[in-house]
């Protein structure tokens, strides 16, 4: 050692080999590489619970009434480090619950409150979520007390419910059962912007046409939940804002009445905070120093008084009595004329003209003072827009009706991504079946499975038809909001029976044979569809020389048209299916990216996606009987031929001009052996997927391939069987 290797800057002398910074991912060199990480983000390696931990069993053992009582009591337990407005944290907790649930969007089912994702980046640091870091810390004593059984996801939503209860509203109900994740969601696309609150033009085709908001987004800016409270791009215009309110709420499956109820009911309590200059507010939690311990948005003006808090920059309460559920929102909004003004922080807001002193809310900490109430541009939209105005007039005339509509809309908002009612736990689950829950009647478990299988095997249906139909029925499942799947057999109902991806003519033929079998044996059509897929699969396994049973769990039910909101299922229509090598049209997004997205929604790992694609190809179940990717001379047998031939260097691969297809040619003769799409060749091109492909191409893994395919197939068929774990 001559000292030449000494760091002259005084840096750490230890060689750091770990890539611990977020700005140094492996893919930084190849930004267009397929991001397989989205398939492995919430596995056992990130979960601190014991392998045998049963969260649903733990939840069922909770003392629900004690939990609710503790959360309700917390509302008025004022803390010096973050004082409550008027000594009541209700408004803050409602905002926490709302902003946790309000990220849900129906286009892909992502977002929402079901996983406690608001604890993690980027949501925990969105500008719209300022001060919610404090709300979560206020809840920590309750979370600490009840431990694993009370997830953050449940506690956050429960806090909103109990806030309303403590302020006089009887809520519609509550379901426990959400399970926490342990890190950021990397599969969710929140927008392409690299700047908080970047101009809305970045995500609209035409800002004057709210419907041109980029799919699947449901917020007007990066970092906001819905709309800009000051107006479109921060420019007040209630009529224009109304159109964006309508579009953003519609994208989370709310109609006009639900939207008006949530807006008015959400702003019946609490206040906005805008004392001080935004330039004086500190950075968000993810950017704050280590000594901040997860807190962000430090406020040098905050002197321990709620009056001086800063959150959105808008300042004031909406109603005269912000800690009471009443009709005060309507009284002020429609009882006064309003004029545009600015908050102390310089944000646009509206204030009433010539308001009576008794209608002014008192100061949050000094009851001897009163302040002007305020309305945001979105609130004024409820008055200016004729449709919202008419709805509000109906609410004003019937307070009980308003409370009921709001209670139901709030329940929908906070439970939309929990899935069917079988996922709910606790004494406050409403008995009523709600159509947005996609209700399914209980199915039979009394019929003879072996007898039904025999009937199916003798039906004359081909293995390919049975496998394809079962797959099409099950592939609609989305783990994001737990919608879709084979249970309910909605593939036989509108709109699914007419989807291009389901090959309507072939589907009608198959259902015409399977439905009578179901009727005659006492099985549900849903069960028979899946069982037929299993029969076809077992036939293909036997043809390949193996004897492997495909597991089956009976008990699926058949939904009716009356139990199905057909329009709400439009978003589940597959635009592409890499597993059946099909896409409806040419898209800017590649076939392999769409396949990856579908695999993530199905809850598959990269290995499961790989084995399923390879197996589906050789089974000959491509959409429209396409031959792309069928790398075998014995189609219909469940063999690893797809992988064997993909990795065989006797062949070369060549793009076909003007098409998203490729030719696989014999290197020696130049003859075309097979054709393929990018959804096929990616398994040889991507280094990670090739590693999996090589496993199944090995001589010693032919039977493993069959077993792994069956396991992955069964996982998809049972993805929506929440009743099995209830």
From Swiss-Prot:
It comes from the Bacteria. Keywords: Heme, Hydrogen peroxide, Iron, Metal-binding, Oxidoreductase, Peroxidase. There is a cross-link at residues 226-252 (Tryptophyl-tyrosyl-methioninium (Tyr-Met) (with W-98)). Coiled coil: none annotated. SUPFAM superfamilies: Heme-dependent peroxidases. It catalyses: H2O2 + AH2 = A + 2 H2O; 2 H2O2 = O2 + 2 H2O. Pfam families: peroxidase. Heme b binds at residue 267. There is a cross-link at residues 98-226 (Tryptophyl-tyrosyl-methioninium (Trp-Tyr) (with M-252)). GO terms for biological process: cellular response to hydrogen peroxide; hydrogen peroxide catabolic process. Its cofactor is heme b. The record marks 95 as: Transition state stabilizer. Formation of the three residue Trp-Tyr-Met cross-link is important for the catalase, but not the peroxidase activity of the enzyme. Its EC number is 1.11.1.21. The active site is at residue 99. GO terms for cellular component: cytosol. One of its GO terms (molecular function) is heme binding. Homodimer or homotetramer. Belongs to the peroxidase family. Peroxidase/catalase subfamily. Bifunctional enzyme with both catalase and broad-spectrum peroxidase activity. This is Catalase-peroxidase. It comes from Roseobacter denitrificans (strain ATCC 33942 / OCh 114).
